[in-house]
Amino acid sequence: MQPITTASTQATQKDKSSEKKDNYIIKGLFWDPACVIA
């Protein structure tokens, strides 16, 4: 699994809207941004 920092960085670069999805990652759900967006 990729570290949360890397996932958050990639998500931010892809879309600012993904910041909301980062909240789920911060909660403890280690989901990849791509999976969440999909």
Curated annotation (Swiss-Prot):
Q: Which GO terms describe its molecular function?
A: mating pheromone activity
Q: Which keywords accompany this UniProt record?
A: Cell membrane, Lipoprotein, Membrane, Methylation, Pheromone, Prenylation
Q: Does the keyword Repeat apply?
A: no
Q: Name one GO biological process term.
A: pheromone-dependent signal transduction involved in conjugation with cellular fusion
The cysteines joined by S-S bonds are none
List residues modified as Cysteine methyl ester: C35
Q: Which domain of life does the protein's organism represent? A: Eukaryota
Composition-biased stretches, type Polar residues, lie in 1-12
Q: What is the membrane topology listed in the Swiss-Prot or TrEMBL record?
A: Lipid-anchor
An example Gene Ontology CC term for this record: plasma membrane
Q: Where is this region: Disordered?
A: 1-20
What are the residue ranges of the propeptide? 1-23, 36-38
Q: What is its main location?
A: membrane
Subcellular localization, as worded in the UniProt entry: Cell membrane
Give the lipid-moiety residues, type S-farnesyl cysteine. Answer: C35
Transferase as a keyword?
Answer: no
Q: What does this protein do?
A: The active factor is excreted into the culture medium by haploid cells of the A mating type and acts on cells of the opposite mating type (type alpha). It mediates the conjugation process between the two types by inhibiting the initiation of DNA synthesis in type alpha cells and synchronizing them with type A.
- This chain belongs to which protein, by name? Mating hormone A-factor 2
User: What organism is recorded for this protein?
Assistant: Saccharomyces cerevisiae (strain ATCC 204508 / S288c)
